[in-house]
Amino acid sequence: LGDYLAEDELDGIRICREVVSHLNWRKKGPGATLPIDEPLYDQEELLGLVNEDLRVPFDIRDVIARTVDGSRFEEFKPLYGPTLVTGWASIHGYPIGIVGNNGPLLSEPSEKAAQFIQLCNQIDVPILFLHNITGYIVGTDFEQGGITKNGSKMINAVANSTVPHISIIVGASYGAGNYGMSGRAYGTRFTYIWPTAKIAVMGPKQMAGVMSIVQRAAAERRGIEFDEEADAKRAGIAEHWAEERSKGLFATSRVSDDGMIDPRDTRTVIAISLSICHNQDVAGTKEFGTWRM
């Protein structure tokens, strides 16, 4: 039995859209509550912000300014932990908290992120994570300074947060940094990537370097001469292998995200995602307080 007859697949999709448009669906969550203004900066410029070489830095605020309503961004603690940008804005009238990378994650930005994520839960605001992260900083000084403890605060806050998370990987998203920035494994409501995205346990050069260190140490333990030529060849193969498999196209082809998007469509994609999130009540967990510095 059927109520409609479609000529082909496209006609069937058209009929489905018409049926859905008359369902009179009402969202449980709040709708857009703030003024909807186009960004003051040209969204076409998003195409040139991220260099093909991800070692070339860029300011994540440039992405934010070309994405949010009226380019308005109320930054939270801008002078503390400046390698992580946090603050509030709106996209198509939907309030949103934003967490974006401007360098590696150290103790201070990790603490700032933990507090900000919990604040967003206190006021029931979804969070947008903009990834360009090589990971948490490592080294004796940083470890003695508490990076493990403070980094875990951020991951703890991400894991316990119940407001919708939307992640967009604009550059690198490596290792534990991916977890701290609410990667796919942390149940984000939506995850999108730009064509410039790279996702891996670590950068290709770093991985090849670690392999060389391990092989060199093994040769020393066995008391044999280390073959530099073979090591260079092996490292080159490993680096190429890791480079190809860290590309965004490789990841998205395996459905590890919700799609690769044109950077110029970022604002529209986020707005649609927020609208979907607001089909249900947007409620943050109130079971923990706000961590102070």
Language model features with spans:
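Ligand-binding clefts of soluble mixed alpha/beta catalytic domains
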Residues: L1-M293
